[in-house]
Amino acid sequence: MRLQFLAPLALVFLSVRAAEPAADLEHGRVLFLQSCALCHAAGPGTTAGQGPTLIGVVGRTAATSPNFSYTKALQDSRLVWDAATLDRYIANPTIAVPGTTMVIAVPVEKDRQDIIAYLSTMKSQPGGDPAPAPTISPEAANDPRDWRHASPGTMHRVVVDQLPAPFATVSTRNNSAVVPRPADARLAVPAGFSVQLFAEGLTGPRLLRIAPNGDLFIAETRSNRIRVLRPAVDGASASANELFADGLDRPFGITFYPAGNNPQWVYVANNNSIVRFPYQAGDLKARAAAEVVVPKLSETTNGHSTRDIAFSLDGRRMFIAVGSGSNFAEGLPKKSADEVARWDAEHGLGAAWDFEFHRANILTTDPEGRQPLKVFATGIRNPVGLAVNPITGDLWTSTNERDGLGDDLVPDYVTRVKERAFYGWPWYYMGKFEEPRHAGFRPDLAGKATVPDVPLQAHSAALGIVFYPASSGAGVFPAEFHGDLFVALHGSWNRASRTGYKVVRARLKNGIPTGEYQDFVTGFVVDARNVWGRPVGVAVARDGSLLVSEDGNGTIWRVTPAAKR
């Protein structure tokens, strides 16, 4: 599913340098599988991901591979991927081409040399890239999960026992093209609600968090910074817009500590570390440099790069979500039964190893980071968003599941996360179903994977989540919404019929999920090929209104009961 952004595409346009005598092709192939194959095809054993193919990239003009929506920055760069240019790009993409959505770098020169040498052996075949999925088809028109059928109030339930077999449909690369928001674009919300533009002109706003005083903290991940907006008195717009901190490393998760009206710290989850800034209520700019709390989360930083953080209700534990480096741990070396048993005993049931060590799981430590990182739960491919239920104390996550098995596999999900539970990845999915690409690899895990609470339509790309509290205020929702969970769906790329691109409401009853979810905000899709918005963050403002960020055109939207604008 969605790679770390991916949105930010992991190694989207790998540079290529002429192979040198010292280059190690096999090492380059392994590095490619570990770092790039999640998004890019480049030869045998790799399939098309959400990024452009890298077959034939050597000598290619930037932003010319068909069937992919490139950033304007890369289109305007007019670069040709010769050895020197491409090596410079992969070393630091955002410096080489400011505005590119590729943020993952390969800092080690020898690694770049080996990857480039491997890529230089990959030549385009007659026929070029595969054609994109058809823009209109009878199948799409009749598919109840297609974007055309999204409508506020529509209920959904994914029944695990009715899932199709793997490869029942062909795995399709069907990227959306992000276009400027049309003048007549209108978001749709349920009857009795209203939605208005809250802020615009932001740079790829991702996760949202509300400070106790009501300020809105925004992760502008691609720009490596945190921004703060202060809502106006009526809550309908921002009266202040300030840069809180920059110079970060792909910041995503934000939270405040300790709980209450006067937190002392703002915690930020970087790609591979946790830092915090001293904070007093009302600060619009960081009052001091960041303090490192956890210096390293994992040994690898490729693949999914979003990291979220949350604290337990008692404030004693800090939870950290770390996504996988790959789609399904392709290329993972095998271990003997004894080696597997020892590994599981030390790192948790079903935990992957090698380049996936400390990946695809939720880690925990104390708020000061003094205790060694421990695995809280395993087998969660890309746990993007975290939230603690303010009533029950349960930890929840949103998860992007694996790609390549067909239009309706594997369901994404939101779920309560149980300590020491195993959620399947990479060996199984949705409890009992074995991953066919690892058939026979871990028979000992049969029947041991936990089934998630709320499966979502496959390839929806669930990102930010927030519980709706029983609050008061000018924008407060009706009581029936209190305790439910809102989920931002960034939208599909690996499905013939487009799905996601909306905000949904997961229903809970007395803190227990019903398994159903409901369309709540729709209207981000223009047509079968184009979208203007991709929802990422959701947050409940101090006045009770719901705020939604989208990183396609850099806007934030505000949902209120219709009579409470």
Language model: regions and residue ranges:
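Beta-propeller domain segments
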Residues: I136-P190, P263, T306, S324-K374, ...
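Detector for the c-type heme attachment site
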Residues: C39-T46, G59-R60, A91, S120
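Sequence/structural segment immediately N-terminal to covalent heme-attachment motifs in c-type
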Residues: A22-P44, L54-I55, A199
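Asp-box/WD-like beta-propeller blade repeats and closely related beta-sheet repeat scaffolds
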Residues: S239-N241, A245-Y257, Q264, N270-D314, ...
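C-terminal capping alpha-helices of c-type cytochrome domains
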Residues: V80-D129, L546, D551-G552, P561
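Surface loop/turn motifs at the tips and blade-to-blade linkers of beta-strand repeat domains
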Residues: L197-L202, L243-D249, V293-T301, V375-G379, ...
